Amino acid sequence: GKRPRVTLTPSIAMKDGKPMMAFGVQGGDTQDQNLLQFFLNVVEFGMTMQEASEAANINTNQLWLSLGGSKVDDRKPRPGNLLLNNNVPDWVRKELRAMGYTLSFEERTSGPINAIYFDWKHHSMWGGSSNHGEDYGIGW
């Protein structure tokens, strides 16, 4: 019965031997899922730190409640179910349903994401934070 009590996810992405961005998220069971989606939104889809922080995301419920808690019946593992942010486009919803997923929706599907982008070309840093907390992306 032991379970982790802290699963902080500070991350640094490197490019050409230099830090490209530093980022992290709160959110228990969904932290790694949300960080990967954030990272891919930046490196694959060209979003800014702020755009990627606020982008809609999708969570699985395969390992729900790994940190413990009291909502055991509500948050037990549900294979084949996905939790989507309300802002996920209709065409994505349609594709996921066609693949056989059961979808549920919430206004907020991620903990606060905070990030700093290191712009080595212009010798500056760019911060971004999701709108899910009272957080700020600050670098110096």
Regions found by a protein language model. Name each.
Residues 1-107:
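Proteins synthesized as precursors that undergo proteolytic processing into mature forms
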Residues 90-140:
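In a subset of proteins, long, contiguous C-terminal domains/tails are tracked
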